[in-house]
C-alpha cells in the first residue's frame, strides 16, 4: 500500500505548465521586461538598454537561423570584451547553436586547430583580429584541401578602433556585424532547449600544463552558475560590473548570464590596465569586477599617477585562476578593495569554491586575514560535492591541514565532458568524480588550500616541495613584482626550485646577480633549506589570456638551462 502511494505521488507528469528546461536565456527575457530602460552594456560612447540588448540578441539568433544555423551547429567568436561578445552569449544559444569563444591571444595554427576541432560553421571576429581569423582559415584550407567548407565570416566593427582593419575585412567578403543583425527579427520567437543537458557553450582549456581540450557545458549548469555567482558574492540588483576578465575565458565565469539575473550594467574594456580600472571605477561607479591575481598585482603596484585613491566607494573583486599571494590580498584590502577568493576550472563553469568570509575573522590582524583568505575555501552553493582525496586509495584525506590529496568535484556545475576525447573523459571522471589535477590540503574548518598542480610539485631528493608556498615567500621580497617557481634539473637532488621573477620598475637597473643572491638569502630565512630556489631568472613571465602564468613554458626553459651543479642543499 505504501509503495502504491509513493508511486502515485511520484508519477505526476511533467507538462509544459510545470516544467521547462533550465537555461540562462530566460534571465535576459526577464531583464528586458523588468528594467527595459536600464543600461545593460556600455562600451566607450555606445550604450545599450536591456530592451535593446534583448532585441539585438533575438536579431542575432534570427539571422543565424535564417542561414540554417541551429541545433548541431557551433558558432565561434574571436573578440575582446565588446558588446557583440556579450550578445553572442544569448543570441547564439537562442537559435539552438553552441557558442565557442576563442582566446584572442592564440596564434593562427592553434586557432585553426580549435575551429576545425569544434567544426565551427560561423566565425564572428572583431575587426582587430580579422587577420588572425584569415590566417587560421588559410591553414585549415591548406590542410583540408578540396573538402574544406569555408565558414560564414562576420566581422565586428568597433568605433574605438581605426577603420582600416574593418575596411580590409569587408573587402575580403566578410559581412559586417550590424548589417548581419539588421537582417534578423527583433521579435524572433526563440525557444528554450528541449533538454537542459543540451550544450550551450564550448571552450578550450588554457593549456597551462598541456594541450588545450574542448570543454562542453550545458544549459542546466550555466543556469545554476548564473544564480550561484551573485548569491555567493552578495551582488545586488543593478550591480555595475567592469569586464576586466575576458569573456572568452570560460564564458567570463558565466557572468554574462549572472548580470542578466541582476539586470546589472556591463562596462566593457578592450584592454585592461591599472589606469583604466581606476578610471572606470570612478567614472561609472563600478561595484564589482573579476580578475586573476596577476591583474590584482598590477593594480596594487600601479604608479601613483595611474591610481585614484582613496577609492570613491568600496569595490568588490573576485579573483581566481591561480593561488593569490597573501601579500597581494593584503595590499588590495589596504587600498579599499574587498577581495573574494574563489577557485575553479573551465570544467566547472569557472569558480566552484569560495573562501567564504567568517565574522570571527573580522577581529584578526590584517596579515592573518589575508593568509586565511588566500585559501580556496568551500564549495559554491551550486556545487553538490567537493573533497580532497588520496590519489592512491580514493579516500578523503583527514582535515588536518597537512595531508595532501587531489581536489575532486561532483555536481551539476561539472562539464558534460571533453569534446571528441574519450580517453581524457575516462581519466578525468574516474571513480564518479571530476578530477581537477590540483593538489590541496583540508584544514580543520574544512576549508581547502591548494598546494600545487600535480604537475608542478617539485621533488627534490625524494621530498615534495610546494611551488606555490615557495612563490608566496618570493613575492614578499621588496624587489619582486611577479614570481613563478618550477623544477630545474639538479645533479645532486634530481630537481631543485628555480624562481622566475619579474622585477618592480624601481629595481630593474639593479645588479641582477646581487638581487638573485639577495632573493635566495631572503628565502633561506623563511623556508626549509631544500625549498630555497637554487637559481633565479629575471624577465617577463609567459601568461595565458587570463593572466595565468604558463608554467609548462618555464619548466621547458629551466630544463634547457641544464642541471644545477652538485648543490649541497
UniProtKB/Swiss-Prot annotation:
Keyword field contains S-adenosyl-L-methionine: no
MF terms in GO: acetate-CoA ligase activity; medium-chain fatty acid-CoA ligase activity
Tissue: Expressed in roots, leaves, stems, flowers and developing seeds.
Pfam families per UniProt: AMP-binding, AMP-binding_C
UniProt note: phenotype after gene disruption: No visible phenotype under normal growth conditions, but seedlings have a strong decrease in glutamine and are resistant to the toxic acetate analog monofluoroacetic acid.
UniProt KW Ligase keyword: yes
InterPro entries: AMP-bd_C, AMP-bd_C_sf, AMP-dep_synth/lig_dom, ANL_N_sf
Top-level lineage group: Eukaryota
Top EC class, one word: ligase
EC number(s) reported in the record: 6.2.1.1, 6.2.1.2
Main localization (coarse): other
Biological process, per Gene Ontology: acetate metabolic process; butyrate metabolic process; glyoxylate cycle
Protein's recorded name: Acetate/butyrate--CoA ligase AAE7, peroxisomal
Organism: Arabidopsis thaliana (Mouse-ear cress)
Amino acid at each position: 500500500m505504501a509503495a502504491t502511494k509513493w508511486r502515485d505521488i511520484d508519477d505526476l507528469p511533467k507538462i509544459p505548465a510545470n516544467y521547462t528546461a533550465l537555461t540562462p536565456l530566460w534571465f535576459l527575457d526577464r531583464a528586458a521586461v523588468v528594467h527595459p530602460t536600464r543600461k545593460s552594456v556600455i562600451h566607450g560612447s555606445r550604450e545599450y538598454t536591456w530592451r535593446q540588448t534583448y532585441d539585438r540578441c533575438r536579431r542575432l539568433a534570427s539571422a543565424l537561423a535564417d542561414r540554417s544555423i541551429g541545433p548541431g551547429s557551433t558558432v565561434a567568436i574571436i573578440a575582446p570584451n565588446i558588446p557583440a561578445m556579450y550578445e553572442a552569449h544569448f543570441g547564439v544559444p537562442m537559435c539552438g547553436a553552441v557558442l565557442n569563444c576563442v582566446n584572442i591571444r592564440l596564434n593562427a595554427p592553434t586557432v585553426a586547430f580549435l575551429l576545425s576541432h569544434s567544426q565551427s560553421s560561423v566565425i564572428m571576429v572583431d575587426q582587430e583580429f580579422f587577420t588572425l581569423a584569415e590566417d587560421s582559415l588559410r591553414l585549415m584550407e591548406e590542410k583540408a584541401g578540396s573538402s574544406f567548407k569555408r565558414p560564414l565570416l562576420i566581422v565586428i566593427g568597433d568605433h574605438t578602433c581605426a577603420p582600416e582593419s574593418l575596411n580590409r575585412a569587408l573587402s575580403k567578403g566578410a559581412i559586417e556585424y550590424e548589417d548581419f543583425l539588421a537582417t534578423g527579427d527583433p521579435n524572433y520567437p526563440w525557444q528554450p532547449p528541449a533538454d537542459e543537458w543540451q550544450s550551450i557553450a564550448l571552450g578550450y582549456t588554457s593549456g597551462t600544463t598541456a594541450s588545450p581540450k574542448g570543454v562542453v557545458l550545458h544549459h542546466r549548469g550555466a543556469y545554476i552558475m548564473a544564480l550561484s555567482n551573485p548569491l555567493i558574492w552578495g551582488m545586488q540588483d543593478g550591480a555595475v560590473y567592469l569586464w576586466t576578465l575576458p569573456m572568452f575565458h570560460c564564458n567570463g565565469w558565466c557572468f554574462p548570464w549572472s548580470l542578466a539575473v541582476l539586470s546589472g550594467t556591463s562596462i566593457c574594456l578592450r584592454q585592461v590596465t591599472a589606469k583604466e580600472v581606476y578610471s572606470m571605477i570612478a567614472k561609472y561607479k563600478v561595484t564589482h569586477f573579476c580578475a586573476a591575481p596577476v591583474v590584482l598585482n598590477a593594480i596594487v603596484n600601479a604608479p601613483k599617477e595611474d591610481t585614484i585613491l582613496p577609492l570613491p566607494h568600496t569595490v568588490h573583486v573576485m579573483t581566481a585562476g591561480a593561488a593569490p599571494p597573501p601579500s597581494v590580498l593584503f595590499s588590495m584590502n589596504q587600498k579599499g578593495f574587498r577581495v573574494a577568493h574563489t577557485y575553479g576550472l573551465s570544467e566547472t563553469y569557472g569558480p566552484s569554491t569560495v573562501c567564504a568570509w567568517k565574522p570571527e575573522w573580522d577581529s584578526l590582524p590584517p596579515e592573518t586575514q589575508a593568509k586565511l583568505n588566500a585559501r580556496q575555501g568551500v564549495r559554491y552553493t551550486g556545487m553538490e560535492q567537493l573533497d580532497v582525496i588520496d590519489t592512491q586509495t580514493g579516500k578523503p584525506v583527514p582535515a588536518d591541514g597537512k595531508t595532501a590529496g587531489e581536489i575532486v568535484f561532483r555536481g551539476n556545475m561539472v562539464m558534460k565532458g571533453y569534446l571528441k576525447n574519450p580517453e581524457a573523459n575516462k581519466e578525468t571522471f574516474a571513480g564518479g568524480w571530476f578530477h581537477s589535477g590540483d593538489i590541496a590540503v583540508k584544514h580543520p574548518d574544512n576549508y581547502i588550500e591548494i598546494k600545487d598542480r600535480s604537475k608542478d610539485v617539485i621533488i627534490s631528493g625524494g621530498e615534495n616541495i610546494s611551488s606555490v608556498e615557495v612563490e608566496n615567500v618570493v613575492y614578499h621580497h621588496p624587489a619582486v613584482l611577479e614570481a613563478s617557481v618550477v623544477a630545474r634539473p639538479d645533479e645532486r637532488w634530481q630537481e631543485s626550485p628555480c624562481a622566475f621573477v619579474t622585477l618592480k620598475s624601481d629595481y630593474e637597473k639593479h645588479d641582477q646577480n646581487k638581487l638573485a643572491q639577495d632573493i635566495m638569502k631572503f628565502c633561506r630565512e623563511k623556508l626549509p633549506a631544500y625549498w630555497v630556489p637554487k637559481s633565479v631568472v629575471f624577465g617577463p613571465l609567459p601568461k595565458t589570456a587570463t593572466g595565468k602564468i604558463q608554467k609548462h613554458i618555464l619548466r621547458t626553459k629551466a630544463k634547457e638551462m641544464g642541471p644545477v651543479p652538485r648543490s649541497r642543499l
